[in-house]
Amino acid sequence: MSDQDHSMDEMTAVVKIEKGVGGNNGGNGNGGGAFSQARSSSTGSSSSTGGGGQESQPSPLALLAATCSRIESPNENSNNSQGPSQSGGTGELDLTATQLSQGANGWQIISSSSGATPTSKEQSGSSTNGSNGSESSKNRTVSGGQYVVAAAPNLQNQQVLTGLPGVMPNIQYQVIPQFQTVDGQQLQFAATGAQVQQDGSGQIQIIPGANQQIITNRGSGGNIIAAMPNLLQQAVPLQGLANNVLSGQTQYVTNVPVALNGNITLLPVNSVSAATLTPSSQAVTISSSGSQESGSQPVTSGTTISSASLVSSQASSSSFFTNANSYSTTTTTSNMGIMNFTTSGSSGTNSQGQTPQRVSGLQGSDALNIQQNQTSGGSLQAGQQKEGEQNQQTQQQQILIQPQLVQGGQALQALQAAPLSGQTFTTQAISQETLQNLQLQAVPNSGPIIIRTPTVGPNGQVSWQTLQLQNLQVQNPQAQTITLAPMQGVSLGQTSSSNTTLTPIASAASIPAGTVTVNAAQLSSMPGLQTINLSALGTSGIQVHPIQGLPLAIANAPGDHGAQLGLHGAGGDGIHDDTAGGEEGENSPDAQPQAGRRTRREACTCPYCKDSEGRGSGDPGKKKQHICHIQGCGKVYGKTSHLRAHLRWHTGERPFMCTWSYCGKRFTRSDELQRHKRTHTGEKKFACPECPKRFMRSDHLSKHIKTHQNKKGGPGVALSVGTLPLDSGAGSEGSGTATPSALITTNMVAMEAICPEGIARLANSGINVMQVADLQSINISGNGF
């Protein structure tokens, strides 16, 4: 070795890469590629020829390089067939000036300079061939490229630690995948101490030093809504209405008197103070305040005050006492009932009522409150209260009536003001009753008026209550049906065992329009007659037909086993309900038009009628018959319309078409069409009066009625109209309240408590069913009147 080679770094780690040449390498003991660390000395040639060589202990860096380079390079191949001249040279790589960097596939060795670098020493000469043993050493240079050190297969899953200076001191990076947080952010390390601040929203911000990134929290923090102190400054403060103090959160409603047209004033209910009027006592106490204060204490009369005592009002006191007997006079009979506005299923009351004629001691602009309680005592509450400044200028007397259900049977005394011109009575009903805003206006020099209101029970029974008012005219702005019938002096005629002789009430001309008269039956009654029009049940879905005093006819068709009930309405046109003749097929077809449909009567055009062969020449009074002239038929009909319908059946003409959706069937007769429509709707309009059964066809009903007739007796015609009398007092006690019910017998078949559906069917047919109370049962024979 020369001195120049010896002056190089002695501790340089070299990697000796020997190409395996087998046993041909006489000087080397290792046949394969081996790694050794050679230290340069002056006797370098002798150390390489000495059989095994002298090797010192390798350094750790050399072992690392040797371990990483066990995989042979692709350009390194062992060729045993070459001659001794082609000896495998050994390359030495100097790792002093190299740097290691991590790549995608492993570690890369980066050269320090781009030029030629003396990286290895190779021994060459005749010692390789074993001929001369001379040693010659020369420096070999490698190009400054990147060397890739691949990982060995036996070093899998091992962590290789290395220190990267200049990035972060005292921190070792592991060759593993990078850390990731929950939300996908990479974990970052700050080199310098960061200042941590926390704001009001719950987010943590790290303010770094120079050249550092900011770590923010992507998670939604708690949103804090800043309180706006100026939000509620625009709210309107609550103020008391009519000098009333509002407390709590209760809704307050102020009733203000409203003036309407016609000198009608509506007063709030709470502006009138009530004083109790005990019905058991004979003295009535009415308290009045002489001062301007709105509230006055009511004075209640006790039972110890006798009926004959009369206490006069003092000058210094504002309260005064009046006796009820001094102004209450009975002008009607004792079987009048208190007015009942209830239309629910409960029965009305039957207690006695006395109608007064005048009331004394009432001052101007005073309000009288008459209220019927729901208690069993049935007391009337009356009171007077001085109105405020709003009503001081009003000089009209107003009475506020609040009718409620009275369940007791005690006698009640009604209060009524003296009849004055322009006097207004305002009536208010409770919320569960149907008559609302009923106004009663006083009319001088007028006859007595009777007000009746119906109550329909669940079984169809109708209960009527009556109240007679003096010098009052009923005005109902909401078109509630109230029947008004002036009472006139009538007498009960003489009765016999066979029939009843009835005297007429009055002529139709003497009674004003709208009243109910029964002239054909010639019905009269006792002085307590109650005439009730069931058409007032308009709220139950029953069609209302006005009655104009035309007679009610009850006729019997000759030769027919059934009864025909007909009503001759306005104009004299007959609308009747034929219960015997029905839809019985082709033998007796019914070609009557629909209700309300008017057709012109036409002469029969059949050949028999034209030739005058339809009527028998021997009997001129015999009913004309219409015979079908089609050969082979010969059917006989009593009506022209029936014959026409039969002829349409022969010709195939079907003018009546069903208008139901997706049907379009056509029929010869109109009754067939009506019967077909009931199959769509499921309507059974024909109800049996004896049992709850209903039928779609009238002939089916007729056959069903005959079954009842066969059980009770033979055919006959009898009509019995009667009701239970209206009891006073005793009838209202207990659960069994006596209520008037319609009782009609046809062919000796009793129809008690007609159901609302039956009444509706009669009303739709144009028949007005009337109910007369306080009458004895009247039996009329078939050939009567």
Swiss-Prot record:
Changing S491A: Loss of O-glycosylation. Increase in transcriptional activity. Interacts with ATF7IP, ATF7IP2, BAHD1, POGZ, HCFC1, AATF and PHC2. Interacts with HLTF; the interaction may be required for basal transcriptional activity of HLTF. Interacts (deacetylated form) with EP300; the interaction enhances gene expression. Interacts with HDAC1 and JUN. Interacts with ELF1; the interaction is inhibited by glycosylation of SP1. Interaction with NFYA; the interaction is inhibited by glycosylation of SP1. Interacts with ATF7IP and TBP. Interacts with MEIS2 isoform 4 and PBX1 isoform PBX1a. Interacts with EGR1. Interacts with SMARCA4/BRG1. (Microbial infection) Interacts with varicella-zoster virus IE62 protein. The 9aaTAD motif is a transactivation domain present in a large number of yeast and animal transcription factors. A zinc finger (C2H2-type) spans 626-650, 656-680, 686-708. The record marks L63, L64 as: Cleavage. Belongs to the Sp1 C2H2-type zinc-finger protein family. Glycans are attached at S491, S612, T640, S641, S698, S702. Its main location: nucleus. In the hepatoma cell line Hep-G2, SP1 precursor mRNA may undergo homotype trans-splicing leading to the duplication of exons 2 and 3. Residues 496-610 are annotated as: Transactivation domain C (highly charged). Changing T427A: No effect on phosphorylation on DNA damage. PROSITE patterns: ZINC_FINGER_C2H2_1 (PS00028), ZINC_FINGER_C2H2_2 (PS50157). Changing S296A: No effect on phosphorylation on DNA damage. The modification Phosphoserine is found at S2, S7, S59, S101, S612, S641, S670, S698, S702. Changing T453A: Abolishes MAPK-mediated phosphorylation, 50% reduction in MAPK1/MAPK3-mediated activity on VEGF promoter and no effect on dephosphorylation by PP2A. Greatly reduced MAPK1-mediated activity on VEGF promoter. Pfam families: zf-C2H2 (PF00096). It comes from Homo sapiens. Changing T739A: Abolishes MAPK-mediated phosphorylation. 50% reduction in MAPK1/MAPK3-mediated activity on VEGF promoter, 40% reduction in protein levels during mitosis and no effect on dephosphorylation by PP2A. This is Transcription factor Sp1. Changing S56A: No effect on phosphorylation on DNA damage. The modification N-acetylserine is found at S2. Residues 1-93, 109-141, 329-395, 567-598 are annotated as: Disordered. The modification Phosphothreonine is found at T278, T453, T640, T651, T668, T681, T739. Up-regulated in adenocarcinomas of the stomach (at protein level). Isoform 3 is ubiquitously expressed at low levels. Residues 708-785 are annotated as: Domain D. There is a cross-link at K16 (Glycyl lysine isopeptide (Lys-Gly) (interchain with G-Cter in SUMO)).
